[in-house]
Amino acid sequence: MAMLKQKISQQDNLSEEELGGFMAEALADIDVSGKKVLVIIPDSTRTMPLHIFYRLLHEQLGHRVKELSYLIALGTHQPMSDEAIDRMLGRSGSEIPRYRVYNHRWDDPNQLREIGWISKAEVEKISGGLFGEDVPVHINKLIYDYDHLMVLAPTFPHEVVGFSGGNKYFFPGISGPQILNFFHWLGAVITNREVIGTKYTPIREVVDLAASKIDLPKTCFSMVIKGKGVKGIFAGSPEEAWDHAADLSAQEHIRFVEKPFKEVLSVAPPMYEDVWTAGKCMYKLEPVIQKGGKLIIYAPHITEVSYTHGKHIDEIGYHVRDYFMKQMDKFGHIPRGVLAHSTHVKGSGTYENGVEIPNVDVVLATSIPEERCRKINLGYMDPGTIDIDAYRDREQEGILYVPKAGEILYRLNDQKTGQ
């Protein structure tokens, strides 16, 4: 694709007709006739009308390409069932062909190929001296069965990389564990408060550098979601499309408030099926919780801490960053991506002379038993005792109710210079 194409709604969201017109125009410029195309898409933990784009890609490419397939950029999330995939893509009862859809498996070495290394010198430069190690770059080798890669994905503020989307759908979306664990821990060391909603971060630099080692044609459709629809869409290289999407995401997905809150009821939507994914309900709110305040993750539907990493989290629990950094020898056997998740959920705080003092009291109001919540070093509330109405419309009292948490970032007015 020679140059960026974009379409932003001046009203609420783009209509299906507008999206169809945009995709037709953008795809007309891409040389994929007779070629095999692999489309990399998010899983169901991201809000996006994938069913619309599944239909549009069929209409625009189905007759042009030799093969059209999809790869779900799961990172370390659990594989999706056939039924869940059909729901996400709107395939149940549809006359659209059932194109092949693959789940990425980060933990299956047979699925991965090493495509290079990020050198110790590069790591030292990018991290400002925080880290000094050679990092191998592995990616799902399925991509090399195809002639052209397309990324079809939303962009939101993100706790590890700053803003999601773009090359993040390669790393960690369809990558191996080494680079994933490395840059998640790098993000955790810099901290969620510093990274989230910041456009260019050291972690984004790692992601883009790793993606530069993929020697295949790549086209990215980066979009910004408003509600359940598409506010804007950008087509181009992964770097360029993401760059513009991140700017629009900063306008649409960051809510500024005057002063911090003492208590937040953060409601996790059903798309978050465990604390691993529902942790976003903390990440997006941490910047507006006062020191000593409380955040409640309200999710009666959640029964598990992490379907993938629960064993490790049961062992280490949730702690502030310095709890790990000051005794890393004790946690060398734990994947650093798990340590990163732990400290992101727990939030900022101190660990001095063996005493841990978090800045925020994070409480789970889920179907996870109290005993397990205490064991993993989080608070517990019985969700059945919570009257949601009692939290509504009390912002002037320092109490915030967030009915669908996890995608909108909250910041204080004095943080408006963070882009």
Where are these regions (language model features)?
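Conserved, well-structured core segments that form the ligand-binding/active-site neighborhood
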Residues: 99, 103-260, 287
